[in-house]
Design a protein with these regions (language model features):
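Short, basic/polar N-terminal leader/transit segment immediately after the initiator methionine
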Residues: 4, 29-31
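Sec-dependent N-terminal signal peptides
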Residues: 32-40
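Cationic, amphipathic, low-complexity segments that mediate targeting or membrane/lipid association
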Residues: 4-8, 19
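Charged, low-complexity intrinsically disordered terminal segments
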Residues: 28, 43-445
Length: 445
């Protein structure tokens, strides 16, 4: 192989001056070590995809990663409760349930019948529900029913009971939806325990939601979260079950990053005074790392702050952003404020789809067909700034693709694309004025 004269001269210069060049490079590195490290970090990041960069960002945020052997998507209430009931029937050691609402209706009654029977069989059963969520329910658990449940051997407690005049307790509520069985399986997502997930509500029609079931070491994280909530002062009385905590409690909160069949899972738990910004930070990191596609389904998309800024940056980078919200929700103010936010996204280039087949209560996001999140977090002030929330960020293309298929099927069969004409039809002037008034209180909704 022959080189040109200029190339040969370059090689000769480098060989003759190699000692000087090495000394000069060492001086540069010594004086500008921080710059060199930043440059190397940027060069490494250029070779990573969105999932790898997001994992790195999550580790900096202090999130723990867990192994997941299996992820099952439960896209409807009927599928979720059938699967949950079957797993509860097979419980041998303990059952832990933490839900924002246990509505006193047919589906709750059927579940309680199974739990009472399992308690008689010697299985330890613990139920935690949010006190405010119970008062806000159409059919709250009565004191009489709770006493009956305790007599059957099931431990049941209300999280942070409301006591007048301490209304500050209204702000930090237990919004979890968690069921752990024998430390082997966890269910989580957007569904409470109520029969409207099967039969709908008169105001909105069908009530659509989504849950997931996971196994593997990720279950440990949810189990530890349950006991942390159970023990939180003011104490839930009586807590006779506190000495019956499972063997998994007390294990290290962070396990090595390992890839299971379902991929690694990052565990994000919002604790008002410990990790108040974690949901905003994780959503921001995920969206900021997206290269091609962001898909979000969320019922209360009153987006602001970090999440709104991240979506705008994604659109400016040329990332395709698809957002799905419901035509009808369970609050007039919610509909109006969400409408204004969706219009802003639409004007910046996002695809906004209005779901027409009832109320879509799911809380999911998919990034670049590489990873996704499913959990309890709404994109409103209550979830992002006040309540106790938990999300699983699942780094698995197969699970993400399956969620995308559900999204795409809904778009094809149950959705209307938001356009300027559609917005004007849905939001006449009077409603837009009302929405702007409601927006003033958005940070408390």
């Amino acid at each position: 192989m022959k080189f040109g004269t200029k190339v040969q001269n370059y090689f000769q210069f480098i060989i003759l001056n190699s000692q000087f060049l090495c000394t000069f490079a060492a001086m540069i590195c010594k004086r500008h070590l921080l710059f060199v490290l930043i440059l190397l970090n940027c060069l490494l990041a250029m070779g990573e995809n969105a999932a790898e960069r997001t994992k790195r960002d999550f580790q900096r945020l202090g999130l723990s990663f867990y192994e997941c052997h299996d992820v099952r998507i439960l896209p409807t209430g009927e599928i979720k409760f059938r699967d949950l009931f079957q797993t509860v029937e097979q419980a041998r050691k303990y059952i832990l349930m933490d839900y924002f609402k246990f509505q006193q209706d047919s589906i709750c009654g059927a579940l309680l019948d199974i739990l009472r029977r399992k308690a008689r069989e010697g299985v330890k059963v613990y139920i935690l529900f949010d006190s405010f969520g119970n008062h806000d329910s159409d059919y709250p658990l009565s004191d009489t029913l709770q006493a009956s449940i305790r007599r059957s051997g099931v431990e049941i407690a209300a999280f942070d009971p409301l006591r007048f005049p301490w209304i500050n307790h209204l702000m930090h509520r237990d919004h979890h939806k968690i069921a752990v069985i024998d430390g082997e399986v966890v269910y989580t997502g957007g569904m409470n325990v109520a029969d409207y997930y099967l039969h709908g509500k008169p105001k909105v029609g069908k009530w659509r939601d989504m849950h997931i079931r996971m196994s593997g070491s990720i279950v440990t994280a949810y189990e530890e979260l349950f006991w942390k909530m159970w023990r939180k002062p003011p104490s839930n009385s009586p807590l006779k079950g506190e000495n019956q905590r499972s063997a998994t409690e007390g294990k290290a909160n962070s396990l090595p990053l390992r890839e299971g069949w379902g991929g690694s899972v990052a565990f994000a738990s919002r604790w008002p005074r410990e990790t108040p910004r974690i949901m905003r930070q994780t959503y921001q990191a995920a969206i900021d790392n997206a290269e091609h596609l962001v898909q979000i389904v969320n019922p209360y998309a009153m987006i602001f702050g970090e999440v709104r800024a991240s979506l705008r940056r994604a659109l400016e980078r040329g990332v395709k952003v698809q957002f799905m919200v419901s035509t009808k929700s369970d609050g007039m103010a919610n509909d109006d404020v969400i409408g204004l936010e969706m219009r802003k996204l639409m004007k910046r280039g996002a695809e906004v789809w209005y779901y027409n087949d009832g109320f879509h209560h799911s809380k999911v996001m998919m990034i670049d067909s590489q990873f996704c999140t499913v959990g309890t977090t709404n994109l409103d002030a209550r979830s992002l700034c006040f309540d106790y929330e938990v999300n699983a960020f699942i780094f698995d293309p197969a699970t993400t693709t399956a969620l995308q298929q559900v999204f795409d099927d809904d778009v094809a069969n149950h959705c209307t694309l938001l356009t300027p004409e559609v917005f004007r039809q849905r939001f006449p002037l009077r409603r837009r004025i009302r929405a702007r008034i409601f927006t003033l209180a958005k940070r408390f909704m």
